[in-house]
């Protein structure tokens, strides 16, 4: 008798992307550490665009992610618009999904300033010698110079 099981790595690329695009945002970190191929797939810009497009259409533009600066730290926030009445009053809920931290510093990174330019967040850190770091929100890739901290969302 033949074994009819199929490993995830044996799936066609389109089907694999479809499966990975259904993973909840909160579980993406666990999925990324499962295998190198999945991590590469999740890091690709094409997949990220497809993932965002799918999540936008699924929530009908009533739920989105935002990055907010609070108390010298950057937070990834999930914003859900519950209701908009006839007078454009909005009922919404905001939930913190993650905080931008330094890999070397468990307490976090103190950010002085954030500038958004061409789909890139440029952050200036508050230290003895301020450092500039760039964060590309679509792929969560960190663009840094050699003197900059390593940053990630937790």
From Swiss-Prot:
Residues 5-51 form the F-box domain. Pfam families: F-box (PF00646). InterPro entries: F-box-like_dom_sf, F-box_dom. This is Putative F-box protein At2g11200. It comes from Arabidopsis thaliana (Mouse-ear cress).
